[in-house]
Amino acid sequence: MEPIIEIENFSAYYGEKIAVKNVTMKIFKNQITAIIGPSGCGKTTLLRSINRMNDHLPGFRVEGKIYFKGQDIYDPQLDVTEYRKRVGMVFQKPTPFPMSIYDNVAFGPRIHGVKSKHILDRIVEESLKKAALWDEVKSELNKSGTRLSGGQQQRLCIARALAVEPEVILLDEPTSALDPIATQRIEKLLEELSENYTIVIVTHNIGQAIRIADYIAFMYRGELIEYGPTREIVERPKNRLTEEYLTGKIG
């Protein structure tokens, strides 16, 4: 199987505090990889590091390498804006912009130079369809994105990420603020999207990871304890810490 992201001996620091310790793992194309572990284990820091979202935090620094399709993403020559177009991010709390549904989705393409109304119309429709939201909002595209329900807002954020045609979508606890029905819809959507996109999701919800992930990475106190196919991790964990986390003995 082809890796699209390769993480090699990667560590991340906030000042003197180490948040991610010497992580090495490969993320495979068109698979769903779930990163699990207790609060403060470094999973969100690792996810944000893949998107270079921590760059401007005071005292943040990294060691080691993260490669996207063979390119070092921390290379000073890297065009970070262009890179983030290829590796999109969806956050824990739905973050629709205070503008219309249409403008939320068209925002990224416009930044990247798309001016044609005809092309923008097509991108908006296609992205909302991919995010399983089109049928619910197609007659009210001028409505503010902030007036949608929580689950709809999160799907709008996914549509916004899809609009710039990424190859990878990173999601940080995307369903933690949603009710069970909205959560189920997002999970189904991610499974569908993985046919064409690589998905990396951070989740506290072990059941969610088991339901949707092809691979699970378990982190504890900044370290990657175990990583492998979901069934293998769940049924035959090699590390005692993994087993204790999965059975609720540590958390």
UniProtKB/Swiss-Prot annotation:
<dbReference type="InterPro" id="IPR005670">
    <property type="entry name" value="PstB-like"/>
</dbReference>
<dbReference type="Pfam" id="PF00005">
    <property type="entry name" value="ABC_tran"/>
</dbReference>
<keyword id="KW-0592">Phosphate transport</keyword>
<dbReference type="InterPro" id="IPR017871">
    <property type="entry name" value="ABC_transporter-like_CS"/>
</dbReference>
<comment type="function">
    <text>Part of the ABC transporter complex PstSACB involved in phosphate import. Responsible for energy coupling to the transport system.</text>
</comment>
<feature type="binding site">
    <location>
        <begin position="37"/>
        <end position="44"/>
    </location>
    <ligand>
        <name>ATP</name>
    </ligand>
</feature>
<keyword id="KW-0813">Transport</keyword>
<keyword id="KW-1003">Cell membrane</keyword>
<dbReference type="InterPro" id="IPR003439">
    <property type="entry name" value="ABC_transporter-like_ATP-bd"/>
</dbReference>
<dbReference type="GO" id="GO:0005886">
    <property type="term" value="C:plasma membrane"/>
</dbReference>
<dbReference type="GO" id="GO:0005524">
    <property type="term" value="F:ATP binding"/>
</dbReference>
<keyword id="KW-1278">Translocase</keyword>
<keyword id="KW-0547">Nucleotide-binding</keyword>
<comment type="similarity">
    <text>Belongs to the ABC transporter superfamily. Phosphate importer (TC 3.A.1.7) family.</text>
</comment>
<keyword id="KW-0067">ATP-binding</keyword>
<feature type="domain" description="ABC transporter">
    <location>
        <begin position="5"/>
        <end position="246"/>
    </location>
</feature>
<keyword id="KW-0472">Membrane</keyword>
<dbReference type="InterPro" id="IPR003593">
    <property type="entry name" value="AAA+_ATPase"/>
</dbReference>
<dbReference type="GO" id="GO:0016887">
    <property type="term" value="F:ATP hydrolysis activity"/>
</dbReference>
<keyword id="KW-0997">Cell inner membrane</keyword>
<comment type="subunit">
    <text>The complex is composed of two ATP-binding proteins (PstB), two transmembrane proteins (PstC and PstA) and a solute-binding protein (PstS).</text>
</comment>
<protein>
    <recommendedName>
        <fullName>Phosphate import ATP-binding protein PstB</fullName>
        <ecNumber>7.3.2.1</ecNumber>
    </recommendedName>
</protein>
<dbReference type="InterPro" id="IPR027417">
    <property type="entry name" value="P-loop_NTPase"/>
</dbReference>
<dbReference type="GO" id="GO:0035435">
    <property type="term" value="P:phosphate ion transmembrane transport"/>
</dbReference>
<dbReference type="GO" id="GO:0015415">
    <property type="term" value="F:ATPase-coupled phosphate ion transmembrane transporter activity"/>
</dbReference>
